[in-house]
Amino acid sequence: MTEAHALAAAFAAMARLDEYTRHFRNPEIARAWFARSETLAVMQASEGELLQEATLCHLLIDDLYELSTLKQRLAPCIHSAILRSIAGPASDEDPLDWIAAIWGESERSNRHRDVGAAQWRHEASINEILAPIRSALTTPTPEVVAECVRQIWVGRAFDGRGKRMALLLAPFLIQRAFKAPLVQCGLARALARDADRTNEAVVDAESWLLHFYAAVEESASRSYEALNTLARVKADLAALLPRERETSRSGPTIELFLQRPIQTAQDIAGAIGSSDFGARLIIDKLIKAGVITPLDGSRQNRSYICRKAMAA
């Protein structure tokens, strides 16, 4: 495939995803799915850690989840950094401060680092890659953004974790390059699928461009299919609940599990504005309907899982 054909295919996939996203009724569910999916992909692509989604959901509740390893506890930090990335810089925020915040968020689990030295290294890292980042922010064409991602990836900035930082910034940069402001599309999963080929392509600017466009197309297509799946899963979960067991808070509770498939009783009560007793009544109905399953914890704050919400 030629570079022109690859770029056209990427634009087409992004346009289809953008159009579907505009009509997707629950953008917060889509955003939550993307953040979880991209976190798992970044953990695999940059950290070499094949993390289960259930473990990630537990870590999002408790970042010291007892059944997790030290390396897995990086996942909530990656998750927060991705959310910071797709939100973009605030209107009055210096983009370089925004980039530093993303990097700092991703390193939050490193509790033993020298904070002062780390801050100096972050500033030095940003200055080292200042030119390609400024180019990508001021002239966000697909070609310029692709080269920016490549230079961050192969550079020695960010304590040698340029690959991670490139993947964290990619969703926002892709969004601007392909002029799809509502789209959430990353690169990590597509690039991790054939790591050897990716490592070969990233060292050469021309080879990388074609590889980058193909990864964008694959990622946009996967996100499109995932949103379709999420819509079906939501309808299927609602259908499991008989009308006589349905309440005005059943729907919001199901949506809560679609945003994070593992929830605690206190999370549910707080999110739907209910008392602990009222939340337990809804939880019992969802358990009887087969929507959720109890996990661990005390009766007062037990965890519950909706396995179907992980289907996408």
Where are each of the predicted segments found?
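FIC/Doc superfamily catalytic core
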Residues: 1-312
